[in-house]
Amino acid sequence: MASASQGADDDGSRRKPRLAASLQISPQPRPWRPLPAQAQSAWGPAPAPATYRAEGGWPQVSVLRDSGPGAGAGVGELGAARAWENLGEQMGKAPRVPVPPAGLSLPLKDPPASQAVSLLTEYAASLGIFLLFREDQPPGPCFPFSVSAELDGVVCPAGTANSKTEAKQQAALSALCYIRSQLENPESPQTSSRPPLAPLSVENILTHEQRCAALVSAGFDLLLDERSPYWACKGTVAGVILEREIPRARGHVKEIYKLVALGTGSSCCAGWLEFSGQQLHDCHGLVIARRALLRFLFRQLLLATQGGPKGKEQSVLAPQPGPGPPFTLKPRVFLHLYISNTPKGAARDIYLPPTSEGGLPHSPPMRLQAHVLGQLKPVCYVAPSLCDTHVGCLSASDKLARWAVLGLGGALLAHLVSPLYSTSLILADSCHDPPTLSRAIHTRPCLDSVLGPCLPPPYVRTALHLFAGPPVAPSEPTPDTCRGLSLNWSLGDPGIEVVDVATGRVKANAALGPPSRLCKASFLRAFHQAARAVGKPYLLALKTYEAAKAGPYQEARRQLSLLLDQQGLGAWPSKPLVGKFRN
C-alpha cells in the first residue's frame, strides 16, 4: 500500500487481491456480523506480557505466522507520558485476533466434543472468519451423516457419525485440530493422504473490508454490551482503523490492523452558537470518529516525544527533517475509514445524472449542504444571519471531499504532523450509489480545469479506495433513546463518552453537562501540550483557537473554498468568532 500521505496512485504494485480486486464499491456485499467478543479466560493463557501491553487489550487483526510490534498504544490522559497498560483488566480482556501468530493457543488440547462447536464458533467470531458447517455425502452406511467445517473457503476434514449433531461436533474438532496444527507447526508439510488445505493467510481468511468491520464491531462490543441502554447506537457506528505493515523475509509482509477511533451519531447540535469552544457541533458518527482520531494522534505525539525508546518504536508518528511539520506518519502505516450509513449530502443525492460532457455536475445535489436548525439545505440557501448565530455544519459528504484534499489532521495538528490521508473507505450501507459516492468525494471541486497550482504544497487530492463492507449494526431499528446521543472513544480512553447532541456536551442529569473531550477547547489544550513536548515554544504564543490554525492549512482551505464557489457549488462557511476563545 502506498504511503497514506502520498495518495493512492503509488500503491498498485503492493496491493494484493485483498484490496486491489475492488477499487470501487461492489454492489452486493456479503452479509456478515461478528459475534461479541468473549472473555479472555475462555481462551486459556493470556498473550505474553510485552505483546499484550503494547496492544492495550484491544482488538487487532494480524496475519502470517509470527508476532511483531503493534501500532503503539496511546498514552493516558493528554499530557501524561505513560502507556495505558491495564485497560484490559479494567474492561474485561477479550481474545486477541491474530491469524495465527506464534504463541496463540486454543483453549483446550483435547476439548470435549460437546464444547467443540461453541469453541470453534467463538474462535471464528473473534477473527471475523466466515464459518460454515455443511453437510456432505456420507461415506457409507456405517456413518449416515457427514459434516465439514469451512473457514472462509478453507474446507477442513469432515466429521462422520450416526447423528447430524455428533457429525457437526466431529467436524468442529477436526477444524480445531487443523488450526492448532497451524499454530504449533505452521511450516510442517502435509502428510495426510487428503489434498493439502489452503494455508491460513490474509488472502483466504479475511478480506480488507471484513477485517475493518470485525475490528469496529469487536471494539464496540468491548466498550458496551447488549444490556447497555446505548447498545442501539451501534446502528450509526463509524471507525478509524490503522494498518501497519511489517516487512518479512522473502518479500512477505505482515499486516496488523488496529482500531484507533470510534464514533456514533446521526445529527448535529441545532442550538445557538457558543463562543467558549466547549460545544460539540457535528455529532455524526463519521465526524466524531475523525475527531477521536485527532485525540489519538495528539497522544501519539506525546508517546513519540516523551515515551522513551519504546514510545518512539510504538508510536505511529516519526520525526522528519526539513522546514515542514516535525512529524509524519511512519512508512507502511495507513488509515482506513469504516462507516455504517451513506454520508448525508451529495453522496445520497442520486436522482440526477452527471453532465453528458463528463465534467463536474453543477446540479443542486452536488452543491455543498449544511445542517442548520435540524434541516439539511444547500449553503446558498442559508441566511447569513443564521450562519452567524446558530450552529451550522456541512454534510459528511462535503467533509469527506475536504479530507481527500486537506487530510484528516485538521488545522491545529498541521503545525506538527504532515497531512494524513485515508487510504480506503468501507461503507456498510447497501442502499447507495457507488458512482455518486465517488463523485461526491473525488470531483468537488474539479481540479482538472484549473490552470497552474491550485493548492499550496504539500496538499494534494488523494483517491480513496471504496469498498462495500459487511454491516455490524443491530438488525433492530435504532430506538428514540439513542437518536439524540453520540458516543466517542479513541485508543487510550478508559471508556465511552456519551454526548447529548442537543447541547453538544457530555450527557448529564443536570441541564448542562461538562464539555466533551472532543470539543475545540480540549483540542487547543492538547495542541499546547504537544507543542511543548515537541519543542516548539513559539506555538505556545498562539493563545486562541483561531490563531493556532496553521497558515498553510488555512491557505489550502481558502483555495478549496474559492474553487468550490467559482464552480457553483457554494463557499465553505467560515466562523472566525467561534475560534476566538482562549484556554
UniProtKB/Swiss-Prot annotation:
<dbReference type="InterPro" id="IPR014720">
    <property type="entry name" value="dsRBD_dom"/>
</dbReference>
<dbReference type="Pfam" id="PF02137">
    <property type="entry name" value="A_deamin"/>
</dbReference>
<dbReference type="InterPro" id="IPR044454">
    <property type="entry name" value="ADAD2_DSRM"/>
</dbReference>
<keyword id="KW-0694">RNA-binding</keyword>
<dbReference type="GO" id="GO:0007286">
    <property type="term" value="P:spermatid development"/>
</dbReference>
<comment type="function">
    <text>Required for male fertility and normal male germ cell differentiation.</text>
</comment>
<keyword id="KW-0221">Differentiation</keyword>
<keyword id="KW-0744">Spermatogenesis</keyword>
<feature type="region of interest" description="Disordered">
    <location>
        <begin position="1"/>
        <end position="48"/>
    </location>
</feature>
<dbReference type="GO" id="GO:0005737">
    <property type="term" value="C:cytoplasm"/>
</dbReference>
<comment type="similarity">
    <text>Belongs to the ADAD family.</text>
</comment>
<keyword id="KW-0963">Cytoplasm</keyword>
<feature type="domain" description="DRBM">
    <location>
        <begin position="115"/>
        <end position="181"/>
    </location>
</feature>
<dbReference type="GO" id="GO:0006382">
    <property type="term" value="P:adenosine to inosine editing"/>
</dbReference>
<protein>
    <recommendedName>
        <fullName>Adenosine deaminase domain-containing protein 2</fullName>
    </recommendedName>
</protein>
<keyword id="KW-0539">Nucleus</keyword>
<dbReference type="GO" id="GO:0005730">
    <property type="term" value="C:nucleolus"/>
</dbReference>
<dbReference type="GO" id="GO:0008251">
    <property type="term" value="F:tRNA-specific adenosine deaminase activity"/>
</dbReference>
<feature type="domain" description="A to I editase">
    <location>
        <begin position="261"/>
        <end position="582"/>
    </location>
</feature>
<dbReference type="Pfam" id="PF00035">
    <property type="entry name" value="dsrm"/>
</dbReference>
<dbReference type="GO" id="GO:0003725">
    <property type="term" value="F:double-stranded RNA binding"/>
</dbReference>
<dbReference type="GO" id="GO:0005634">
    <property type="term" value="C:nucleus"/>
</dbReference>
<dbReference type="InterPro" id="IPR002466">
    <property type="entry name" value="A_deamin"/>
</dbReference>
<dbReference type="GO" id="GO:0006396">
    <property type="term" value="P:RNA processing"/>
</dbReference>
<dbReference type="GO" id="GO:0003726">
    <property type="term" value="F:double-stranded RNA adenosine deaminase activity"/>
</dbReference>
